[in-house]
């Protein structure tokens, strides 16, 4: 088996769509909105594509997405592309795959996470009229202020407001709860929720459930699969998502990785 660089969207998508729930993020990154920030590598055996990983450069730090149900193949691919990896990057890795990098890299573990997707036929609660509003790109400044207090250290890309798929609740002119997307692609029929947070003073009032439900209803008009990532020890968030109809589909680990 050998590795190759992949440049054909159709070939990548044909492979990834075999397990949409696991690969919502990389599938969404095939969209023209994200594609310029991507590098793709594949493991090939007798001309057949056996595994795919993605390096995404759309954030301040590159992010490696290396997720698979077949960790042996994923291990083999990562072993081959190790010399091509940047000196420092963030990573989403299937369980135990990190072992292939431990001899050449220093790894800082950021916890076990799980992937969840919204089950078909889920009943999403309706918010009161005008309680939740769609957030425009013009409100980027107010959104950044909200996240500094409510979700410090989060991965917020202001470009994502251009998708029109951010929703929030305001009080006194300021946001007190927001739900958004990390990935959104009607072309590839997927969306990944992200940056869901409530101001500390307004938690435990069901606001995150309201904004997330509103956003899911909006997204379901455009895409067929909605997913999200959440830390396994974030019990309140998981309870909120289960209430809305999300189900667990996989576990993975997040790391900051640097060459030794």
Segments (PLM) and residue ranges:
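Conserved catalytic-core motifs of GNAT/GCN5-like acyltransferases
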Residues: 108-119, 247-260
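Short amphipathic alpha-helix that is part of the acyltransferase structural core
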Residues: 1-24, 120-154
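Conserved active-site tyrosine of GNAT-family acetyltransferases
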Residues: 101-102, 240-241, 246
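Acyl-donor-binding surface of acyltransferase catalytic domains
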Residues: 56-128
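Conserved beta-strand-loop-alpha-helix junction that forms the acyl-donor binding cleft
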Residues: 91-98, 228-238, 254-260
